[in-house]
């Protein structure tokens, strides 16, 4: 079900089965020429059906729809390659896009664990059952990269991108 939050701005609640988070709030901006979906849910059938139902209720044509992913976690990115069409742009942070390019993704974790003696077979089992891996996009998305301060316009809305990294460029964690 889609709830109108403001004129032209809607929320679709996407269930996240077996997750302590319970649901993801996916936001949809209906524009005159293009629509924008913000975050998609896990790449699972139940999530896909909830999203499709909400989009159908709103009369969203995916051929006229772009996507913005707020960060790299599978509950936010999982369905994007199932929903996006040839005409869709997928907006994503330049920093988080490195994960999908292999700089800081699952393979780095696997390599690190193996170098430090974690048994490869156990690692593959653990990875196969991890929801962040299991429910991620089917294929690598093609991104339109965003940087801090960039603007996205859709309908009556202008969204400003604000980078809020927990790691600096050298990989040091920020705390405080």
State the predicted function of each range.
Residues 2-58, 173-176:
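Conserved beta-strand hairpin/beta-sheet module of binuclear metal-dependent hydrolase folds
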Residues 7-14, 129-135, 155-157:
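Short Pro/Gly-enriched beta-strand edge/turn motifs at strand-loop
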Residues 8, 29, 39, 71, ...:
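Divalent metal-coordination and catalytic microenvironments
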Residues 10, 89, 144, 158-160:
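Conserved beta-strand segments of alpha/beta enzyme cores
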Residues 19-21, 144-146, 164-168:
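A short catalytic or substrate-binding loop motif that flags glycine-/basic-rich loops and adjacent residues
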Residues 34-36, 66, 157:
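Structural motif
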Residues 43-47, 56-152:
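Active-site HxH/HxHxD metal-binding segment of metal-dependent hydrolases
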Residues 149-175:
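Core dinuclear metal-dependent hydrolase active-site scaffold
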